[in-house]
């Protein structure tokens, strides 16, 4: 892999690389790498559009300079540890974001299924910025494009976690069940996303 540029947006260290075939990848390091890769696999298996993510325990990057953040994941010779690679398709163009409470799929079972999946994954970062609309060959695809804040505890600012199997295993899942709907436990942002799901 060849270093292209550092991405300073967001809270997780990220940079772009290019492989030998000329394919661009967004590399993310840090706490979210394993949880995000696992979450995208589960969402894809359930039939939802996702980013194409892969986890590599080690990744050799040629020409890697000193990064503004994330150097604790880099060792001598440009070896990056605990990396998530997200494929950047030339056919895919981001055209916007979508909100949980305002989108073309309100009251549809597919959106309700996605709401259940967010609960199952314990995704506590459900802000609109993490939901993308991509255009691929004239087709619009709506997806949750950042699922790194998963597999932990959905608690408040001081008690929430991500990529923590122990916290995930001990967290509550179902809050309330009625004949026509269920409420799932969500202590993070956008609690209403996981409430009153038919």
Where are each of the predicted segments found?
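Short secondary-structure boundary micro-motifs
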Residues: 1-2, 103-105, 167-168
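Acidic-enriched, low-complexity/disordered segments with a strong bias for Aspartate over Glutamate
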Residues: 7, 16-19, 51-53, 125, ...
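Conserved kinase catalytic-core segment
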Residues: 35, 41, 93-163
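C-terminal catalytic region of ATP-dependent kinase domains
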Residues: 138-198
